[in-house]
Amino acid sequence: MSEEETVSAPAPASTPAPAGTDVGSGGAAAGIANAGAEGGDGAEDVKKHGSKMLVGPRPPQNAIFIHKLYQILEDESLHDLIWWTPSGLSFMIKPVERFSKALATYFKHTNITSFVRQLNIYGFHKVSHDHSSNDANSGDDANTNDDSNTHDDNSGNKNSSGDENTGGGVQEKEKSNPTKIWEFKHSSGIFKKGDIEGLKHIKRRASSRNNSSINSRKNSSNQNYDIDSGARVRPSSIQDPSTSSNSFGNFVPQIPGANNSIPEYFNNSHVTYENANHAPLESNNPEMQEQNRPPNFQDETLKHLKEINFDMVKIIESMQHFISLQHSFCSQSFTFKNVSKKKSENIVKDHQKQLQAFESDMLTFKQHVMSRAHRTIDSLCAVNAAATAASVAPAPAPTSTSAYAPKSQYEMMVPPGNQYVPQKSSSTTNIPSRFNTASVPPSQLFVQYQPQSQQHVTYAKQPAHVPNFINQPIPIQQLPPQYADTFSTPQMMHNPFASKNNNKPGNTKRTNSVLMDPLTPAASVGVQGPLNYPIMNINPSVRDYNKPVPQNMAPSPIYPINEPTTRLYSQPKMRSLGSTSSLPNDRRNSPLKLTPRSSLNEDSLYPKPRNSLKSSISGTSLSSSFTLVANNPAPIRYSQQGLLRSLNKAANCAPDSVTPLDSSVLTGPPPKNMDNLPAVSSNLINSPMNVEHSSSLSQAEPAPQIELPQPSLPTTSTTKNTGEADNSKRKGSGVYSLLNQEDSSTSSADPKTEDKAAPALKKVKM
């Protein structure tokens, strides 16, 4: 098949191209026409790609945008649409319909806006001034384009006659309606005509898609804006509605892999921006900055630098002076032992005066530096304001009293101990002469921050007031006022040991016992104000230190000092085991001894009788922890605590009946063999604790006894004599009657029948 057969049939000159004509058909016709003008070499450039014709040199697959742009500029068939400027540093673009069609040869789109966006991404920017198509055609490039066009018209290729006529009609319309021509230039100037090696240095900007879209919107809004007339101008194809409708109706982009349908953005109407008078952008021009500066800017800058150097020298001298003062004082302080006290005090006073003078000098220096800094800022602002007012309004502005007039007040960070008062002075007498430069006028108003009457202001050392709640009473005035309603009345407990009418405590009967209610309010303790938090119940380590503690201002304590603090605590309550009147006077005043419970249940070791009686004393059951069998004088020891508890119970039963046990009872040998334990008699368990209840307990029926073998223990004559001597003293003792049941029972019987009726039992002497 020949190459002529692949080209579509020619259309009549009067009829436009059909709507179904693809993108490649127009390009193929132009390519064939150019090929005929060059001598018939267009057959090499025409290639068949499926059902579509692609004309022109095909760029490589891996070519990037910048190489494609250079190839488009070198393509002579597109010189009437895009071409180099005479300088070779920029290029011109005619944004018409034919240029959008030509983009399909190198790119996969026909959108001029996308092409401009890619130019912005690679560093190209649009030159501000626009060119018209008539001015552009007057140059050498226009002549070249005209010659090529006439040569194309005179070519003998008949296959492209229809497309040429169509292209000629479009060109005639473009000439009748001249459009603006855009000029683009690379920001770094690397993109030049003939410099192919410099293309590899042009890189894509690492900018986001949002920035590129914003730039494209700015370019699209500025492309049709006429700065001179202030009106928005449209290209010929957009200004004529009929032309635009026909042109877009005939043009349908054909992209490989895309549907043959008109995109939606071609159907939408173009939304124009409102007219706006844009102010000229301020460029970073050094010449303009030099013009905005005051004429004496360099002289003022040099003066400021000199003053800063003087300040540094002053700081160094001040540090040296301070170090010398400390060194001299330390050297003199070692001689205080060899010098009299008065002379040493004079040395300390001289050192303090020198420190005060040094501190005042440093404060003056600081004030001078701060005022000069404010004066410098204000002077520059005043000069700039005057220059701006002179350039805008030629009328003379009202002159101020001084160009260096500072602000009325300045914010300064002042230590909490030093209280400065701003004072205005019309002269600079407080500033040393070395700091009075010629640039400072004598009428300058400095904001002087001077201390009050005291020159040497020291921070008040307030000791942290942490009251000692253990050794020192808390005064009334020390309590904060927010607790006044809490303790409006004194809540101190009665002191049961305090004597009445300043009399010493004696053995007289009194009503204030230790068993009284400790929460009873005191009648009068001499408190003048409200008590706001408890006494002697505050732990300093747990106290909330975030609350401010007032100072100790009250001389009077909250309770009398002569009373010991330990008596404020309530005495422990004792359980009333019996009548307190039954105790003797010497035992009544002595505190009772409390013993803890025994962990061992003593009654579980021996069987109890069925008819066990409960003691009527204080409503408690009789549970002895120290049990002796009548026939066995050896004691059976369970625990010392249980023994003491039983004895304490027995001590409260009857008056004058408590006799201390012998120490040998507590250390008696325990039984080695549990099988040799004696029998526990029911009469022994049911025996009364004192003599008063013996009549009520004598009617109890005895329980059957448990017979156990009884060990024989030797007895001595000393034990018998001791028992006979103490027998008369222990007749009324409840413990004695408990341990020696037979003796107490036979005391009321006939003494003649004692040896016959009573069995041989051993007695345990206390």
Swiss-Prot record:
User: What processes does the entry annotate via GO biological process terms?
Assistant: negative regulation of invasive growth in response to glucose limitation; negative regulation of pseudohyphal growth; negative regulation of transcription by RNA polymerase II; positive regulation of transcription by RNA polymerase II
InterPro entries, alphabetically?
A: HSF_DNA-bd, WH-like_DNA-bd_sf, WH_DNA-bd_sf
One GO cellular component term: nucleus
Region (Disordered) location: 1-52, 129-181, 203-247, 547-619, 657-766
Q: Which residues bind DNA?
A: 64-186
Q: Where is the composition biased (Basic and acidic residues)?
A: 171-181
Q: Name one GO molecular function term.
A: RNA polymerase II-specific DNA-binding transcription factor binding
Subcellular location field? Nucleus
Q: Which domain of life is it from?
A: Eukaryota
Keywords from the named record: DNA-binding, Nucleus, Phosphoprotein, Transcription, Transcription regulation
- PANTHER family annotated for this entry? FLOCCULATION SUPPRESSION PROTEIN (PTHR10015:SF396), HEAT SHOCK TRANSCRIPTION FACTOR (PTHR10015)
The protein in question is named Flocculation suppression protein
Q: Which organism is it from?
A: Saccharomyces cerevisiae (strain ATCC 204508 / S288c) (Baker's yeast)
